[in-house]
UniProtKB/Swiss-Prot annotation:
SUPFAM superfamilies reported in the protein's UniProt record: Coproporphyrinogen III oxidase
Catalytic residue list: 131 (proton donor)
Binding site for a divalent metal cation: 121, 131, 169, 199
Gene that this polypeptide is encoded by: hemF
Site entry (Important for dimerization), positions: 199
Superkingdom classification of source: Bacteria
InterPro entries for this protein: Coprogen_oxidase_aer, Coprogen_oxidase_aer_sf, Coprogen_oxidase_CS
UniProt-listed Gene3D superfamilies: Coproporphyrinogen III oxidase, aerobic
Identification of the protein by name: Oxygen-dependent coproporphyrinogen-III oxidase
EC id: 1.3.3.3
Catalyzed chemical reaction(s): coproporphyrinogen III + O2 + 2 H(+) = protoporphyrinogen IX + 2 CO2 + 2 H2O
Entry's localization field: Cytoplasm
Length: 303
């Protein structure tokens, strides 16, 4: 989807809105981390004799005079081989070569951005990998963006008819249908288009939703409507993904399943390093490199 021209101008209470968004993202982080630790505790199948994982949090600040920072929350456990749940709130100025690509930054390079980003790589190949992020960005304009997508690593489960796929899609659809400012059909198609490995001519997973540059007019609810929808995307994810994990994490798997999982993880690496907009944004705005690249899986192979 082509980037739209967003209206220039900010509401008088933009600072209060920034603070509300930041608090929401950080609260969602804490909710998800607690939920994922509960999944670690609840394992009864393979590897249940191992100690359950716990998140390790690390705060970071931007360097070289740039403003803001964030928190990395990483866990390696018996359910999640690697999962990162990160929040950040950063501000400063876009570099000259990056300004023209960002709405409202061409003539004024100042920006503020806050958000949450999550990628989970489970141990059990029966449990799909997942990605979720939502964010608020402010330049001389303002908008929300984000989404969530599911990546089953076994070919027999990587279908739209699979029960996990249907459950995930339904959760995202409900989150969208409850808000007039959201367009589920467009966001689902955008996700399919965005999470596509062009050099392989194949999708990364089974999809989900993806949206960006959400800036509704005051007549359709404005910032409040956009923020309400973005919160419901986070809530939908926090509800549906643990259900999917619990329905699969006690199942047995084979060495062939593990091999297929590692090969599928290679597609994750290829996408994140070649195409991912968030990775490029973070690296070009002086983000925390360790946090940005923590989305990469811990063990990968290529055939």
């Amino acid at each position: 989807m082509e980037r739209p021209e967003l209206p220039i101008g900010l509401p008088d209470d933009i600072e209060e809105k920034k603070e509300a968004a930041r608090k929401w993202f950080e609260g969602l982080r804490d909710t998800i981390c607690a939920s994922f630790e509960a999944l670690e505790d609840g394992l009864e199948g393979p590897l249940s004799d191992q100690e359950p994982g716990r998140f390790v949090a690390k705060d970071w600040s931007r360097e070289n005079g740039a403003g803001g920072g964030g928190r990395m929350s990483m866990m390696e456990g018996r359910v999640f081989e690697k999962v990162g749940v990160h929040t950040s709130t950063v501000y400063g100025e876009f570099s000259p070569e990056f300004r023209a690509q960002i709405p409202g930054a061409k003539d004024d390079p100042r920006f503020w951005a806050s958000g949450i980003s999550l990628i989970a790589h489970p141990v059990n190949p029966n449990v799909p990998a997942v990605h979720m992020n939502t964010r608020m960005v402010v330049t001389t304009s303002r908008w929300f963006g984000g989404g969530a997508d599911l990546t089953p690593v076994l070919s027999r489960r990587r279908t739209q008819e699979d029960e996990d796929s249907q459950l995930f899609h339904k959760a995202m659809e409900i989150a969208c249908r409850n808000h007039a400012v959201a367009d589920y059909d467009a966001y689902k198609a955008w996700c399919d288009d965005y999470f596509f490995l062009k050099h392989r001519n194949e999708p990364r997973g089974i999809g989900g939703i993806f949206y960006d540059w959400l800036h509704s007019s005051d007549e359709t609810g404005g910032w409040n409507a956009d923020f309400a929808f973005t919160r419901d995307v986070g809530r939908a994810f926090a509800m549906v993904y643990p259900k999917i994990v619990r329905s699969n994490f006690n199942k047995l798997w084979t060495e062939a399943d593990r091999d297929e999982q590692l090969i599928r993880r290679g597609r994750y690496v290829e996408f994140n390093l070649l195409y991912d907009r968030g990775t490029i944004f973070g690296l070009k705005t002086g983000g925390n490199v360790e946090s940005i690249l923590s989305s990469l899986p811990p063990v990968v192979r290529w055939p």
